[in-house]
Amino acid sequence: MATPTQEQLKTLEQSRQRLVQLTRSLASLITSLNQSDPLPSWSSLQSQASIISNNLLSVSDHLSDNRDLLTSLVAYPGPDYPGRTQANTLEQLLRTKLDPRVEDWVARGRKAGASALEDKSGLAEAELAELWDWAPVEANQEARRRNWGGNFTLEEREMGVQNVVTGLARVLEDEGSESEDEEEGEEDEMEIVGVRRQSAGAGFEFDIAPASAAQHQQQKFVEPAVPLEDILRFMTTGAEPGKR
């Protein structure tokens, strides 16, 4: 192969920089796990994991974009390379096989990818679209048949809570009577009692029980305690609201 051009050398330098960033972010995570007592907060770990994920994505995209160049390059030592003092580095540069552990990871990844491509039992795009149309409505209807937040499910209450084996030393109270009293005082509250897909066009239709006039008068608009932007940032990076 001819001497690399300046553009090719620039690509190699970019590869080196991305790999250095990935190595440093991994080393930072390992150091924080090994030396911190107690362990770092989950928000800190989430932030570090996000950085590592971004670095991995950057390396993957760069290697894919420059696949032809990187697969055609051949490394060899020049006459001026200090082979005696830098033997370990030279061995790594001239290595033609992956590390045994890495080779096993690559083999498993390729096997999993090939299995996914050969799987003919998967759903077609039309079937997936139909599934996603069906799932939200069915999940909503199933959720409304459950007793969320209680000690017993509706099925367990119907067959008798005294027959339920919980495996707990303490006895769980049946909150059914209390919830019935609460429901009597909340009959006039607005409640979504059903959901279904619209007959024409996209979207859903909800069946809503009307609220009383007194309830309408008492309703007041309340500003959210945490802005939506901070909530999304907290979900993706782990950063606490109000902190950047």
From Swiss-Prot:
Example GO biological process: regulation of transcription by RNA polymerase II
Source organism per UniProt: Aspergillus oryzae (strain ATCC 42149 / RIB 40) (Yellow koji mold)
Xref: Gene3D superfamilies: 1.20.58.1710, 6.10.250.2610
Presence of the UniProt keyword GTP-binding in the record: no
Keyword Endoplasmic reticulum tagged: no
Similarity comment: family membership: Belongs to the Mediator complex subunit 8 family.
Described purpose of this protein according to its UniProt entry: Component of the Mediator complex, a coactivator involved in the regulated transcription of nearly all RNA polymerase II-dependent genes. Mediator functions as a bridge to convey information from gene-specific regulatory proteins to the basal RNA polymerase II transcription machinery. Mediator is recruited to promoters by direct interactions with regulatory proteins and serves as a scaffold for the assembly of a functional preinitiation complex with RNA polymerase II and the general transcription factors.
Protein location: Nucleus
Keyword set, alphabetical order: Activator, Coiled coil, Nucleus, Transcription, Transcription regulation
Single GO MF descriptor: RNA polymerase II cis-regulatory region sequence-specific DNA binding
Coiled coil (UniProt feature): 6-30
Assembly notes: Component of the Mediator complex.
GO cellular component, one term: core mediator complex
Protein name in UniProt: Mediator of RNA polymerase II transcription subunit 8
